């Protein structure tokens, strides 16, 4: 976890594992997490790093967009989550997708 300012921290991305940047906004009343990461493990790693800094866990999670590498960690989240209406529409659609190689290949062809 790296400190950007007194109120903004971030966990670095890792292109080898498609781990995105995940952010913590440190507020005076509560902390906000930006994006959930690409897996439950990624989500828990973020929380561990927050604790290592002596900061409180986030009380709210904001999702910037629906891509899997920013949302698959949501299944491990136990705080309220917010997203735009458009992002939520895509998340509701994507939750029914199959993740076989064939299904992913078909989605790549059709967009």
State where each predicted segment sits.
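Conserved beta-strand hairpin/beta-sheet module of binuclear metal-dependent hydrolase folds
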Residues: 2-49
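A short acidic, often aromatic-flanked loop/helix-cap motif at beta-alpha or helix-coil junctions
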Residues: 17, 89-90
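General N-terminal targeting signals
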Residues: 21, 25-28, 42, 49-51, ...
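Active-site metal-binding motif and surrounding structural segment of the metallo-beta-lactamase
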Residues: 41-87
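Metallo-beta-lactamase
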Residues: 92-111
């Amino acid at each position: 976890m790296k400190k950007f300012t007194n109120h903004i921290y971030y966990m670095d991305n890792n292109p080898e594992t498609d781990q995105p940047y995940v952010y913590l906004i440190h507020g005076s009343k509560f902390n906000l997490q930006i994006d959930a990461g690409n897996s439950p493990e990624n989500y828990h790693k973020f929380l561990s790093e927050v604790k290592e800094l002596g900061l409180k866990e986030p009380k709210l999670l904001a999702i910037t967009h629906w891509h899997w590498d920013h949302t698959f960690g949501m299944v491990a989240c136990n705080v309220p989550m917010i997203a735009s209406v458009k992002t939520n529409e895509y998340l509701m659609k994507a939750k029914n997708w199959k993740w076989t190689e064939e299904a992913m290949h078909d989605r790549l062809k059709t967009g």
